[in-house]
Every structure is written in C-alpha cells, then in structure tokens.
A protein has these predicted regions:
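Extended, low-polarity segments enriched in aliphatic/aromatic residues
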Residues: 1-164
Length: 164
C-alpha cells in the first residue's frame, strides 16, 4: 500500500504493521507508532513534545481496530540518530518482534534499544527526546500495555545478545 494516501487504509479490512526497529531523532523511537503517520494528514504535528500523541493515529477511523499483526524488522537495527542510517549506531540484532498488541511490541522494541544503548556506553544512555508515545499509547489511548511485567515473551532461536 502506498504510504500517505489515506484512501488506501479506508479500503482495507485488515492491516499488518511492518516497521523496522530504530531510534528517531524527533520522537525517541520510530518503530510501531510511526507506522501510520503518513496517513495522519499532518505528520510533523507528532514530533518532539507532541510525540505522545502518536497513539491517536491508531484511533483514526480508517485505521482503528484494523491492525491484526505488528511485525517489527529487528534484523539490522538502529539505536541512535534515526531514521536515517548511521553506521555507528547500526547493529545486527538478527530478530523479529511479533505481536497483536502494538504497545507491547513497541515496549519490547524500546527495551532492546535501551539495553543496546546501555551496552554501548557502559551506563544508561536515555533516548532523546524521550519516547513519550509508548506510555501514552497505553494510558491515554488504551491501545495495549506498556508494562514489561505484563508482556508474555516467547523466544525462538538463539538467546545470545537477546537484550531482554
């Protein structure tokens, strides 16, 4: 489906979100909740301090309730300076993150980014700006859970460098 044309998701009865795992210099994280931003009519209104509003895009009438699967490409990820690739911050995570709860998938994605950033610096290295959209999608927009302890994670494959 061509991104940006709001008539496209209107025609669909089901959507699959296929974002890549990456940090974003305007929203902290640029993975799940930015998937449908081009359909919002005003993408720039969701950047920086307004990034907490990204969840409202998932409640637009032509998107709400249609996403049946979120599949994050975490094969080769970006933990800073995104969305443009910067080789200093790319690494082969070699994973896929799948789920039906977009907030849970974004929470797991955020956990992986934060753990990689901590491993790179040897100390906590918070995303900047902070990814306000994750907790807001849970608390304000009721799209799922942002509490890691409530998320059931099933691992398949190797466990080395899992960061979870």
């Amino acid at each position: 489906m061509a991104q940006g044309d709001p008539s496209m998701p209107k025609k669909c009865t089901a959507l699959i979100a296929l974002p890549a795992l990456k940090a974003h210099w305007l929203t902290g994280i640029g993975t799940v909740f930015k998937t449908y931003i081009m359909y919002s009519g005003n993408p720039s209104s969701y950047n920086e301090e307004n990034s907490a509003k990204l969840g409202e895009i998932w409640n637009l009438p032509f998107v709400k309730g249609k996403t049946k699967l979120v599949l994050v490409d975490a094969l080769y990820t970006l933990c800073d300076k995104g969305p443009q690739p910067d080789p200093r911050y790319k690494w082969a995570y070699n994973g896929l993150i799948a789920g039906t709860d977009p907030v849970a998938v974004e929470t797991v994605s955020l956990q992986i980014l934060n753990e990689k950033r901590k491993a790179m610096r040897g100390e906590p290295w918070p995303l900047s700006p902070p990814p306000l959209c994750v907790e807001a999608a849970d608390k304000m927009y009721k799209l799922g859970t942002s509490q890691m302890k409530e998320i059931k994670i099933e691992h398949f494959g190797w466990k080395q460098d899992l960061l979870l």
